[in-house]
């Protein structure tokens, strides 16, 4: 946050981070695995009594926000929440991959997966998550690599061109 030298921006980022930490604590699904994981619901139901789906790209975008904030501010709470959220993705692993090799857009409260994913948006989010993961932990996350490779193969097979090829490039070693 400090890199921008804009105090109002920094305060807004910190305010959103505090909101999101609280939101995630109240609106998540537990995903069991070697390390417990959370999938944070995309939206809260107005009545507060109905859980909504978790889209993979939203989960990744929030992980990316938290890891970026951790790298800037050094608050271990941000890294810890990003880690438990990433565990939610990793614990499901190949279940995110649809039969056609694309990724499922979302996981629903009943545990099912579905909806058509964006052509390249989630791919870029995955690459950015991998870049940030490497910056924090010094290595790649293997399940992220698996999802990146599957999405890239689907993109290649379907003629999808990524208009933002530079995203995550510094760290992702794609093997298609």
Name what the model sees in each region:
Residues 1, 12-17, 60-65, 82-85, ...:
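Small-side-chain structural scaffolding
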Residues 168-176:
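Conserved small/polar residues in nucleotide/adenosyl-binding loops
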Residues 1-2, 53-70, 114-134:
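Well-ordered alpha-helical segments within folded domains of soluble proteins
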Residues 70-120, 124, 130-131:
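Surface-exposed substrate-engagement region within the catalytic domains
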């Amino acid at each position: 946050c400090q890199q921008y030298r804009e105090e109002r921006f920094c305060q807004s980022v910190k305010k959103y981070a505090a909101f999101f930490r609280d939101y995630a604590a109240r609106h998540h699904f537990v995903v069991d695995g070697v390390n417990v994981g959370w999938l944070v619901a995309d939206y809260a139901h107005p009545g507060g009594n109905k859980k909504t789906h978790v889209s993979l790209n939203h989960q990744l975008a929030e992980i990316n926000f938290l890891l970026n904030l951790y790298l800037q501010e050094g608050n271990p709470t941000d890294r810890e929440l990003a880690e438990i959220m990433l565990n939610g993705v990793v614990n499901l692993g190949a279940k995110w991959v649809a039969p056609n090799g694309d990724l499922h857009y979302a996981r629903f409260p009943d545990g099912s997966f579905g909806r058509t994913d964006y052509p390249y948006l989630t791919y870029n989010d995955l690459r950015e998550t991998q870049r940030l993961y490497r910056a924090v932990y010094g290595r790649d996350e293997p399940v992220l690599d698996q999802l990146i490779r599957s999405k890239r193969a689907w993109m290649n097979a379907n003629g999808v061109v990524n208009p933002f090829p530079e995203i995550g490039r510094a760290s992702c070693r794609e093997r298609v």
